[in-house]
């Protein structure tokens, strides 16, 4: 913002003439490092509740007997198993029941969670069960943020897909709030062009996409 003000004062820049605007931010990364993100719960396939604890069984220093892995962003008591099952072929073996989802949701809200992350087995192949549970939660708790791993990062490998969705749910409210303020200030200063946000892979995305997929 300071640079924009300097260009206006020194060179007579008209913000309305700006045709390309890209912004990079570390708000999401800082949120993870500082561990001050959103209070969220994880709903996963029943009997796979240890996905974040097991991870890839790697430790930071393999030859150090005292090496400790970082604690998961979601503690084990906020991980809830849902009775559902998708086969690796994408065929539904067990469809989720609303009563089961409602019980898990009630427990998550009672624990103080303000958002839900969904990551079911094989949802990268077929997101039907995840999207069904997302719709149930949106009906039972309107306005509660819900992140689906199948929508966020639909790739094979359960831990990688789950942790990506968890990070997205963890940082999304903070990133969205930051981008809302950022866009408001720029528009107030007269910038009218589309606002692009730098992605972690070096590309760019629109600001609306950045709000929805904060982990990218």
PLM region descriptions:
Residues 1-216:
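N-terminally biased helix-coil "hinge/interface" segments that flank
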């Amino acid at each position: 913002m300071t640079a924009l003000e300097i260009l206006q004062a020194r060179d007579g820049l008209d913000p309305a003439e700006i045709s390309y605007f890209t912004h990079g931010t570390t708000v999401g990364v800082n949120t993870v490092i500082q561990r001050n993100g959103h209070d969220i719960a994880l709903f996963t396939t029943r009997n796979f509740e240890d996905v974040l604890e097991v991870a890839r069984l790697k430790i930071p220093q393999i030859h150090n007997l005292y090496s400790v892995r970082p604690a998961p962003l979601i503690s084990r008591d906020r991980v809830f198993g849902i009775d559902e099952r998708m086969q690796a072929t994408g065929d539904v073996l067990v469809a989720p029941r609303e009563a089961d989802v409602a019980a898990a949701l009630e427990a998550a809200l009672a624990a103080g969670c303000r958002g839900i992350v969904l990551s079911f087995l094989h949802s990268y192949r077929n997101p039907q069960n995840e999207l069904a549970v997302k719709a149930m939660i949106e009906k039972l708790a309107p306005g509660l943020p819900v992140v689906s791993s199948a929508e966020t990062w639909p790739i094979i490998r359960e831990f990688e897909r789950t942790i990506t969705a968890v990070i997205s749910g963890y940082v999304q409210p903070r990133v969205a709030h930051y981008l809302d303020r950022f866009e408001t200030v720029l528009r107030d200063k007269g910038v009218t062009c589309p606002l692009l946000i730098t992605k972690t892979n070096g590309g760019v995305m629109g600001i609306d996409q950045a709000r929805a997929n904060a982990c990218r």
